[in-house]
Amino acid sequence: MFRWFLLCYFFGKPIRSETAVVTWRLFVEMKLDTPWAILEASERQLVAVLHEGGYTRYQHVTARGLHVCMDRLVREYEGSLYFMLESSLDETEFSKRLQKLHGIGPKVAEIFTRETTEVFARRVE
């Protein structure tokens, strides 16, 4: 679930979608695919990966934003999007919680939550 979230995070930035995918793949290859791994990486390390992925602007802002987003996710939800989802009453609440994370707006939350509809549907059964 986190890898999908990370890709959605990149899709929400003012970059080409191809750049978002390349950057996401680099994060996965470099084992920067958990909130804790991103928090442990220095801003300089994140900037280098973002640059390698094709970011020509906003690398520092994005690196800092990732740190802020991951810090809150770890502090409030033990680093688990699944925990956030399970503690939400419905998709609307889940979307609102996502949007409290730095860098997550309504569109990113909408893209991400498309993949969680099934979880909420199972609760009703």
Explain the meaning of each model-derived region:
Residues 12-22, 73-79, 118-120:
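Short helix-capping/linker segments at secondary-structure and domain boundaries
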Residues 17-27, 60-69:
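Non-catalytic DNA-binding core/recognition domains of DNA-processing enzymes
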Residues 9, 26-29:
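Amphipathic alpha-helical segments that form the core helices of the histone-fold
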Residues 3-13:
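Short, hydrophobic/amphipathic alpha-helical patches that form generic packing surfaces
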Residues 29, 55, 117-118:
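Residue-level marker of structural boundaries
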Residues 10, 89-125:
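Catalytic DNA-binding helix-loop module of base-excision-repair DNA glycosylases/AP lyases
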Residues 32-102:
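Alpha-helical ds-nucleic-acid-binding substructure associated with the helix-hairpin-helix region
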Residues 4, 18-21, 92:
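A generic alpha-helix surface/boundary motif
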